[in-house]
Amino acid sequence: MLDPALLRQHPADLAERLRSTRSFDLNIAELELLESERKRIQVRTQELQSQRNSKSKAIGQAKAKGEDVAALMAEVAGFGDELKASEEALDAIRAKLEGIALGLPNLPAEDVPLGKDESENVEQSRWGTPRQFDFAVKDHVELGAPHGWLDGETAAKLSGARFTVLRGPVARLHRALAQFMLDLHVGEHGYEETNVPLLVNADSMRGTGQLPKFEDDLFQTEVGESRRYLIPTSEVPLTNIVRDEIIDAERLPLRMTAHSMCFRAEAGSGGRDTRGMIRQHQFEKVELVTACAPEDSDAEHQRMTRCAEVVLEQLGLPYRKVLLCTGDMGFSAIKTYDLEVWLPSQNTYREISSCSNCGDFQARRMQARWRNPVSGKPELLHTLNGSGTAVGRAMIAVMENYQNADGSIDVPQVLRPYMGGLERIG
């Protein structure tokens, strides 16, 4: 959530920044009307509260003197209903203003390029050279389906579209990738392994920015009066660990990682990526989350992105690093790097990791703070999140980049200890 002071004090400036960087139209007239009404009702509410307090004090003094307080009691009762109505109206106005604030995206950092969509993202670097094949390249479905290793038909029978059953050595490869990523991030990159719930409450979803804007893309469960959401990424529970907390400076930065299933309705994906495992309702990801002091978030962003790059480099997968433009950034981010891995079957790079600095945007929603040792006061943390990496897409990239003419797949050297020494699949 943006600083409420921006909404109250500089609505026109904020509206222009949102329009120019996010193509977001803020209704200033509605905002100013609500703010004016809030001020009016708040003044009247405070007047009534002051009168109540004054009369209550007078009643106490009169009782102490043994005087008749019936008239004073009647007077208090006379404006009690108005005070209650005024307080309720004030709460309603505040709720509307908060609803507007919760729907506003974060403001991009100054060094983020302006752009309308992914076509205006800016490539930063490339690593590795895409392999030149001397045979017709197969995609991951053609490599896995004939052996029953990758089975979309059975998954469709069980659950519908955008699900996949994995079997045999490909299922083991998928598991090996997740274990390798966790071991790397914990053992070499200093993240703390964390096992998180897959079901979270609405407060958690609001904290990281999924609610209220993206509710249509979330899977929900209801049991009685209890509603929970299946996580779209373990960013949600990991980041919310610091919700309503004040973290001592000595504990910062907090670096956490989790391997989890993720669930997305893909409400806006239409007919994109319907073949294979590129875009699924259920998938697995190794997530990286950091909470730190504001002055450290830029360096932590670079560090986190580098940690994700190391995964791809150790797997020997060519990739490129892209700085997202304002029109392609996520709702909560101030700056985002995407890592895109080379897929031979598509002859292009596809996103496999997205690493974002969210500044104090999520922390303000969560009231996640740290105690500044200089001032001694609680201040908002900065939060960051990144994929380290998507497991299914990493598996696809390994299958396609390491394929042989006979349809077999070489196992990357770094994964062989996790595969019982297996050097080739098929």
UniProtKB/Swiss-Prot annotation:
The keyword Aminoacyl-tRNA synthetase applies. Its main location: cytoplasm. InterPro entries: aa-tRNA-synt_IIb, aa-tRNA-synth_II, aa-tRNA-synth_II/BPL/LPL, Ser-tRNA-ligase_type_1, Ser-tRNA-synth_1_N, SerRS_1_N_sf, SerRS_core, tRNA-bd_arm. One of its GO terms (biological process) is selenocysteine biosynthetic process. Pathway: Aminoacyl-tRNA biosynthesis; selenocysteinyl-tRNA(Sec) biosynthesis; L-seryl-tRNA(Sec) from L-serine and tRNA(Sec): step 1/1. Keywords: Aminoacyl-tRNA synthetase, ATP-binding, Cytoplasm, Ligase, Nucleotide-binding, Protein biosynthesis. Its EC number is 6.1.1.11. GO terms for molecular function: ATP binding; serine-tRNA ligase activity. ATP binds at residues 264-266, 351-354. It is found in: Cytoplasm. It is an enzyme of class 6 (ligase). One of its GO terms (cellular component) is cytoplasm. SUPFAM superfamilies: Class II aaRS and biotin synthetases, tRNA-binding arm. It catalyses: tRNA(Ser) + L-serine + ATP = L-seryl-tRNA(Ser) + AMP + diphosphate + H(+); tRNA(Sec) + L-serine + ATP = L-seryl-tRNA(Sec) + AMP + diphosphate + H(+). L-serine binds at residues 233-235, 287, 387. The keyword tRNA-binding does not apply. PANTHER family: SERINE--TRNA LIGASE, SERYL-TRNA SYNTHETASE. Belongs to the class-II aminoacyl-tRNA synthetase family. Type-1 seryl-tRNA synthetase subfamily. Homodimer. The tRNA molecule binds across the dimer. Consists of two distinct domains, a catalytic core and a N-terminal extension that is involved in tRNA binding. Catalyzes the attachment of serine to tRNA(Ser). Is also able to aminoacylate tRNA(Sec) with serine, to form the misacylated tRNA L-seryl-tRNA(Sec), which will be further converted into selenocysteinyl-tRNA(Sec). This is Serine--tRNA ligase. The gene is serS.
